């Protein structure tokens, strides 16, 4: 295992694989990769807060289900609201909140932290700078365990200095590890990454 910094595009690849798991139907059926979070069996780092946002995103404020609502999906590592379509509302006795029929976020916003981007390498020290990932898939869905490959802009860093590019590497780890107790910091500066939902792929 290596210390690693995941650039926003790399982290988006991981989160987008799991984001349909916020849906009411997926959670009610027990098939969500976020089941452990919403059942209280696991928590993410308290640094992690995610919203389904309306303002500032690229998605329209309406779906075929009606007007979307801003939702706090994860609050400081703990489960928040779920995405509820009209069908799930009727089936499970919930209140619909404008989620699309697939019940995945259309404009997922992850709150930033306190780390300045210019200090990333210094904070990393020695380890991997991972700029992008691809071929992501589940190796163990109930555990939110993901596998995939580094893509480009992956470098070996020593003592806060980039030493060399790294050949393609395979990863296999759980979202509860990436964003769990081992998470040390999040960068402060937001980055808008269009078209990153699971349903949009």
Ranges and model annotations:
Residues 34-201:
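Dual-mode signal for accessory low-complexity, basic/Gly-rich regions
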Residues 24-32:
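Mature, solvent-exposed C-terminal subdomains and processed small-chain segments of exported/organellar
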Residues 1-22, 80, 178, 186-190:
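Internal alpha/beta scaffold segment
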